[in-house]
Amino acid sequence: MASTEALLPVTSLQDPLSESRSDQIPETRRRRPIKVHLAVYSGLLLIALYVTLIVTHDGSKAEIATESRPRMAGVSEKSNDGVWISSDDGKVEAFPWNNTILSWQRTAFHFQPEKNWMNDPNGPLFYKGWYHFFYQYNPNAAVWGDIVWGHAVSKDLIHWLYLPIAMVPDQWYDANGVWTGSATFLDDGSIVMLYTGSTDEFVQVQNLAYPEDPSDPLLLKWVKFSGNPVLVPPPGIGAKDFRDPTTAWKTSSGKWRITIGSKINRTGISLIYDTTDFKTYEKHETLLHQVPNTGMWECVDFYPVSKTQLNGLDTSVNGPDVKHVIKASMDDTRIDHYAIGTYDDSNATWVPDNPSIDVGISTGLRYDYGKYYASKTFYDQNKGRRILWGWIGESDSEAADVQKGWSSVQGIPRTVVLDTRTHKNLVQWPVEEIKSLRLSSKKFDMTIGPGTVVPVDVGSATQLDIEAEFEIKTDDLKLFFDDDSVEADNKFSCETNGGSTARGALGPFGFSVLADEGLSEQTPVYFYVTKGKHSKLNTVFCTDTSRSTLANDVVKPIYGSFVPVLKGEKLTMRILVDHSIVEGFAQGGRSCITSRVYPTKAIYGATKLFLFNNAIDATVTASFTVWQMNNAFIHPYSSDDLGVPSST
């Protein structure tokens, strides 16, 4: 079985730092007007002070129940918000980051604002020749707060133009933030946008907005409905547990239907509402779905996938050849879980195909097994596909973010379809347009024996696209299966098994990206094969960031999961490397891992790529191609500049 002996030249393996998150932040309440009445009774010289608290809320606000409690940290909060500054009390000493290192961390082809904080993707859509992307944005700092809707447009989902801010918190019903929302195309092609507002009393309500000028392909100006809010927390739902409306879909009765995430005690739930005009709503007594002990469901998504085709489906499509996906972002764990199941339109309910891997269950399915949260899909009618966006937060300290002046990126948009071979999971793949950034390429065919580390000569290794196939030598597989001393291992975990330094008979093997020449810094992305039940192979796909940087004030987890490998399939992976972000896709996208890494030595020209096989017994053949990647064209829009490069 596995040995902890490592042949890779590495530094001592440290336990990954645990991510910490403050569950509560202080709430600053708006001061209410106070009238002070002073009555002086003549002859007695007694002064009585009467203080009357007068609340001047309008009628619609008075209908909203509020709770006097601390504001809960929601999707928008940075997960590792501690600042490590000394080792005297057991905390990790902060690394002396400098501008040279921090400048290198900024990505070249992932979307991010010019500066400051960004989180959830909002309301993505394709309209009059442009892809629109809205996002949670703080225009004032590199930390969460003052949330508005940023806005950018693209012709191809890769090259972007920043547009003016789309919506700001300028009304009582969104005074504390214009939070996450979704777009819906109506039957006549017009657009409505539902979004969550955090009121001046920190109550979460749903609001309606629409384009001021539908003829404008850039959708520069948005109008908020005069009757907002259109939905308030219903009885039994906490004032701060009611957020993130989905894209609406058409029911068989012709009404529009949306779902909104919430919780009741520790049960995560998805509320259902019907509407005909997006201004008035009918709440269903039943829930679309609920799962006990999963906590608050944020950024719920609900959409159909085809059982037979590899194209995407409009959100309203239903029928016998369709399955439906529910995704919820778990506030407690910061993980995006999904499940596949059957939707009953008449009852407005959904049931999972496999209850043992229901939404939010720890052994259930995830979009991504790394740093990926608050995701949102949309149907791209331009190319007949469903596109997934996901927020990739930082794993460094907030102090480092402030120093570099920005925080967070978005993942490369992915297509999403049902795996028509397994019928049990989704497959995600970077949109085809990313290939337009490929520059020079090199092809390699290598056979690497046990304990081998091989440098891969590709020149600069900061911006790469790698596609690879691996095969384990047949004789080694036969010996492995025939060895009765090797027991089945169905509980192998990338996170707890020692990472890429833990040696087994058939792994780990893969690539070390963002490595320095001496491998003191490296981020291995790899497969590990174990014996499963009934003489089958179990394959796990992992990313080990525990040695990605010499800095200690960084969270450095080991990510991974089992990945289905069907009979006759080779082991395949694709890796996108873009400075401080690594995105890995195994078996055509059945398993995905996104990581944030912060090298201090493996930067600029010192960044290297290695192929490794740290197995004890197996010889592995690797066939792969490595492309250098160009920069994406991402800059502010001007009326004189419409020449955006396009791959379409």
UniProtKB/Swiss-Prot annotation:
Pfam families: Glyco_hydro_32C, Glyco_hydro_32N, INV_N
Binding positions for substrate per the UniProt entry: W117, M118, N119, D120, Q136, W144, W179, T180, R243, D244, E298, D331
A GO term from the CC aspect: plant-type vacuole
Annotated metabolic or biological route of this protein: Glycan biosynthesis; sucrose metabolism
Residues the record marks as active site: D120
One GO BP: abscisic acid-activated signaling pathway
Transmembrane domains' residue ranges: 36-56
Region (Disordered): 1-28
Catalytically driven reaction(s): Hydrolysis of terminal non-reducing beta-D-fructofuranoside residues in beta-D-fructofuranosides
Domain of life of the source: Eukaryota
Residues on Lumenal side: 57-648
Subcellular localization: Membrane; Vacuole lumen
Tissue: Mostly expressed in stems, roots and flowers, and, to a lower extent, in mature leaves.
GO MF term set: beta-fructofuranosidase activity
Residues glycosylated per entry: N98, N265, N347
Role played: Possible role in the continued mobilization of sucrose to sink organs.
PANTHER family in the record: BETA-FRUCTOFURANOSIDASE, INSOLUBLE ISOENZYME CWINV1-RELATED
Official protein name in the record: Acid beta-fructofuranosidase 3, vacuolar
Organism this protein belongs to: Arabidopsis thaliana
UniProt lineage: Eukaryota, Viridiplantae, Streptophyta, Embryophyta, Tracheophyta
